[in-house]
């Protein structure tokens, strides 16, 4: 896979609630028993280095043995506070795989991709966390390659026909599977987002306005 040209960083900070001093604690109590995840900040940086807001993203989580939890976790920013289904760290280490944008249709640690939408899909590699080391910094990489065309002023769009637009990306294995369905992709920005790797020759059409 081509090396990503930019990245977005999501910092996850895990905090442990403070137990009330009510005389209920015992010698077997430990901080890990109450460890839960919280997110302190989430920022995205564009090509120009400027920060962009990210209102939501998705996460898949694995247990200590590497087994995938069934939940496709949606993370939302509500009035400046990140909210999502609670994830406990008391039962062992966890592996985190984050992606953007969130989609409820994703399952099994896989992202369904469609190049016709020209969505800037982002993914992360695995980050391990535990009750003893609960803080994680996650880097999201661009999954698609950005190809920019220098066009005359009269050209308002770039179009590629007969392109294999459908694909699946496994966050757990890092493998990209391009499917045989073909169609037309286009963009009015002078750039196209394409799947990385070797591709057959493509016919690029410049569309005048």
Where are these regions (language model features)?
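Short aromatic-acidic-glycine turn motif
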Residues: 164-174
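Sec-dependent bacterial lipoprotein signal peptides
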Residues: 1-22
